[in-house]
Amino acid sequence: MPRRSNFLLIILVICAMVPLSWAVVSGPATELTSASGSAAATQSEIENQSEELQNATVYPRDVLTYHYNIFRQGQTMLEKVLTPSNVNSSTFGKVKFFATDGKVDAQPLFANQLAVPSGVQNTLFVVTEHDSIYAFNAATGAQTWKVTALLPGETPSDDHGCSQISPEIGITDTPVIDRQRGPHGAMYFVAMSKDAGGNYHQRLHALDITTGAELFGGPTEIQAKYPGTGDGSSGGFVIFDPSQYAERAGLLEWGGKIYIAFTSHCDRRPYTGWLMGYDAGTLLQTGVLNLTPNGNEGAIWMAGSGLASDGQGFIYLLTGNGVFDTTLNGNGFPINGDYGNAFVKVAIPQLTVADYFTMWDTVGESNNDDDLGSGGALVLPPFTDNNGQYHYLAVGAGKDSTIYVVDRNNMGKFNPNNDDAIYQELSGAVSGGVWAMPAYFNNTLYYGASSHALKSFSISNAKLSASPTSQTPTTFPYPGTAPVVSANGTSNGIVWAVENSNPAVLHAYDATDLFHELYNSNQAGARDQFGPGNKFITPMVVNGKVYVGTQNGVAKFGLLP
């Protein structure tokens, strides 16, 4: 039987979103997709899962992972303080700033009612590109603890002459917290560093969330090899070189394993697409998958979005421009195992490709750096069509301005002539291209493309609307925006989005009509401003507060005193 912490992740999703059986257009679903992904779960399986969920420890107001849940839906449905009527410049604004020693590229995390040496408090966790990890009292702003991921004699990595993560590279990825691990709970993240001899390191850390102490004998040096003759190969294996990579994608915990993925520095070869698994209790490597082992490129970065899962034993991710083998085997898979520029479904814990989709002109898109990998994958709840048939879907979009909706049980694979095998394709729906994560709330999908408005697409009859149902009056400069939604159930929905400008701007919109802007942080002059923008930032909303990462800390917004 799976350990209880696996079900803790599910119950956090449930508390923040939907009943156990999800929510669908026509009402609550009575079936769940089975672990095989090919059939409905039996009623007894659902009941067994329900019992496990009821027995798990519940922390309903925690934010322990990127975009609230493993589906990466970006919605919290427990918000009872912030409403469309009180989020305005007269009653809402910046109330605190948590200063840090470096850029905050990762989404902050939050543990409700955490016991620390000084008592019990709501705790905000922040990581920086200076390789520092902070725990703050979320109410007072007092620093509970601060530790470094650096070993003696080390510094954060230099930026390799690449402006994508600059001026230093430390902790870019959003961590994941498991409150059931270790004596008080564990936070997992990957940190990059450089030693006095000029050697680069990528390490997986697990910290006690009460003290900041390393757990499980960590940190673990990340090393890997995989059969292949692609970029950076030697002796029939592609070799993971820590100097060539950065870990930008948010970490995923599922089934007692931590999953991490890597991208390049400014597409500078040699590099390939790495996905790795580690045991959450020992930090020992449990699996490695390379998605371009006999080719090149095809890395995983997704603008900092978290690796997504359906909770049924599969990861969903998008790869960047790279080699895709257009010659397929009898089952429709690339003969050399190269999946550049693709929407990929990976079976866990074994880390094998279970299915995929890529567009008919994938080679041309990769050659033009017009790939899918700049956006994140989002797993949608089950929907029923007008015939009562269930559909299990995931969605992704990248630089080609198209929203791709895949059937998770039959993603579509590759057809050299057309994309007819995909479930739904909305060409040109996100003009400008996507360098961000979407959000889902109440049968609506929200996408913020680069240099365009944030748009909403409704879902009906298990299909996305062909055109936006609303859009913001605001145009979001590169890289667009990664929204989140706060609500009390399905009421009082607010869409939050950060504009990457100077100064950066936090926006709030009515979730039912994006043209109705409720608030932005420029409306009160300097009072609510928080410095220049930081790309790929996504807000985090919890307990009536909104937290936004910046170039030197985290800004906190809430109702004014």
Per-segment meaning from a language model:
Residues 23-58:
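N-terminal propeptides/leader regions of secreted preproproteins
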Residues 453, 465-480:
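Detector for outer-membrane/organellar transmembrane beta-barrel domains
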Residues 59-383, 389-414, 435-457, 480-487, ...:
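Mobile, glycine-rich extracellular loop/lid and propeptide segments
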Residues 2-10:
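N-terminal Sec-pathway targeting helices
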Residues 417-430, 468-473:
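Inter-blade linker and blade-boundary elements of WD-repeat/beta-propeller domains
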Residues 527-528:
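A conserved acidic, glycine/proline-rich C-terminal tail/linker
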Residues 10-21:
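Bacterial N-terminal signal peptides
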